[in-house]
């Protein structure tokens, strides 16, 4: 239990930040699912459009260190490869 006023405040801030970060991670997972769904439908143009928006989301979350930069890079790479493989 937090004993000082500063520790109590930091505990409150940690809870608030955790909720915010959780919502951003959820947004990231939702956008990745949207790209995968677009890939499954077979519409390459739509998949590329959704991927562009998802790529921006992934970058923002990696910049805020909510997701590791290597994880973000791997996700973008795999989604991009899946879109490129649609033509083949």
Swiss-Prot record:
Keyword terms, alphabetized: Ribonucleoprotein, Ribosomal protein, RNA-binding, rRNA-binding
Disordered: annotated segments: 1-29, 69-88
GO biological process, one term: translation
SUPFAM superfamilies reported for this sequence: Ribosomal protein S20
GO CC entries: cytosol; small ribosomal subunit
Top-level taxon: Bacteria
UniProt-recorded Gene Ontology molecular function terms: small ribosomal subunit rRNA binding; structural constituent of ribosome
Keyword presence, ATP-binding: no
Keyword Ubl conjugation: no
Similarity-based family: Belongs to the bacterial ribosomal protein bS20 family.
HAMAP family, sorted: Ribosomal_bS20
Job of this protein: Binds directly to 16S ribosomal RNA.
Protein name: Small ribosomal subunit protein bS20
Source species of the chain: Polynucleobacter asymbioticus (strain DSM 18221 / CIP 109841 / QLW-P1DMWA-1)
Gene that encodes the chain: rpsT
């Amino acid at each position: 239990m937090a004993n000082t006023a500063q520790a109590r405040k930091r505990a409150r801030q940690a809870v608030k930040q955790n909720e915010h970060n959780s919502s951003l991670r959820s947004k990231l997972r939702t956008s990745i699912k949207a790209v995968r769904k677009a890939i499954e439908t077979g519409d390459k143009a739509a998949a590329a459009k959704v991927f562009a928006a998802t790529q921006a989301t992934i970058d923002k979350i990696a910049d805020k260190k909510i997701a590791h930069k290597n994880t973000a890079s791997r996700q973008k790479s795999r989604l991009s490869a899946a879109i490129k493989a649609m033509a083949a």
